[in-house]
Each structure stands twice: as structure tokens, then as C-alpha cells.
Amino acid sequence: VDKDCHAITPYINYLDSRTKEDVEELASHHYEIWAKETGNPQPNCMFPAMFARWMMNNCEGFKEKGRKFMHNAPYILANLAGLSAEDAFIDWGTMSGWGLGYRVTEKKWSKEQLEILGIPMEMMPKIQKPWDIIGTLSETFAKETGLKPGIPICAGAGDTMQSMIGCGVIKPDQAADVAGTCAMFCIATDGINEELSKPENELIFNSGTLENTYFYWGFIRTGGLALRWYRDNVCNLSLIHISEPTR
């Protein structure tokens, strides 16, 4: 975003693979700090940290006016509150969605990792607790939404982090299998597990919404999306005959 917290780059979702070559090059260095500080042993083309590198190298608008990197949900909340780039934020669950660049247990950006990534610390948003109040609904967006101005706005949390709470996965050794766009099998732990954070396991590690909650997840990137594709492109629902149940 620019100094006024307005978007100046396209939104890139995690299905995008434009960073594949950069990921392969960065992974070839085998930096141990990734697993040690984030729980993620290697870069991945769906990590926002890699998108940030791509934007810095390829988006002229960002090179000229870029001030902060922001996720989509914090971006919307910040604009509802009328914040500037100086007040840009990210909750600690969504922070861990960056994949690289932070200390997951300390909930802080990692100076060492960001230097490896080539991302300036000053471009990173401040890290908030999900329940922190980041501002109030502005007069402008109160008129747009029909809500009362001054309503407190909290930092919020990541979608998968919240879905774990919805599934009741809040203690170590609890697990859930969810298939939205991506099919994900998630299991809660009490922190980074060295065995699980080995590259060959191809697992991703995140911080949960609540304090001292963490989980690993394995995934099929389009596992849920494939169901819709099958329905829309393979099935001809008009030819499907549903018989009456037998008694």
C-alpha cells in the first residue's frame, strides 16, 4: 500500500505460482533459520514473503510509492478505520501466514530473516493481538455501510486460525480436516516440533489465534476446488438419475 493505505499492487492469492523459480533458488541455500524461527523449513511459492520479493522486483508502482506490505483482511479493516500506512498492522496468526520472516513464538519480525529475504523492516506492518482495537469505524465508511461511526474495530485473525477454533482444535494433539479451496489436515501442537519441521515432511507451521496455540498442516493445494471443477466440467447433472430409496 502507499502512504495513505491505498492498494498500489494487484492482490495475489496463494494459488498463484509466479514465485516458483525464486523459491527454488532460495531453497537451494538450505538456511536453518527458517525452521528454527518459523517452524517452516523451506520457502514455498504460496508464502506472502515470496510475493513481497516479487512485488519489490516487478511492480513499478510499489517501487515508487510502496510503504507497507499488507494482507487483504487487515487492509480492509485499516481502511474502514481510516488508518494510514504508518498504522498498518497484522495479527499474529496472519503474521505466521507469511511463511518466512518472523519469530513465531515471540510474535516478532525477524531482522535476520528479512535481511536474507531482502525485505526492509520498515515495510512490515506492526504485529497485533487478534483482539487489539486498531481503530474505530470512520465517518466515511459509516455512511457507506450504514453502521454507526466510532464502532471499535479489532485486528481480527486468519481464516484457518479461526476455523481451528470453530472445529474445537485448541489443545495439542487435537486435529481437523477441512476442505475449502485447499484441502488441509491440521493438528495442534505446543510449539515447533523439530521432527515435523523437516523439509521432507512438507508441512506448514502456524500460530493460532489464541495465546500459545500452534498447529501444523499438510495440504492438497486445490483439494476442495477440485470438487467444484469435477462438478462443473465432468458431471452433467441433467443426466444423473436419482432413484427412490428402496424399502
Question: Which role fits each region the language model picked out?
Answer:
Residues V1-K3, A7-L26, G66, M70-S110, ...:
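Glycine-rich phosphate-binding loop of actin/hexokinase-like ATP-binding domains
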Residues P10, P125, P152, E244-P245:
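Proline-centered helix-kink/hinge sites
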Residues Y14, H29, N44, W54, ...:
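Tryptophan-centric aromatic hotspots in well-structured domains and transmembrane helices
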Residues E32:
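A short beta-strand-loop micro-motif that forms or neighbors metal/cofactor-
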Residues A35-G158:
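Gly/Ser/Thr-rich active-site cleft segment
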Residues T145, T181, T246:
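Ser/Thr-centric signal marking residues that sit
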Residues S238-T246:
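Residue-level detector of conserved catalytic or cofactor/ligand-binding positions
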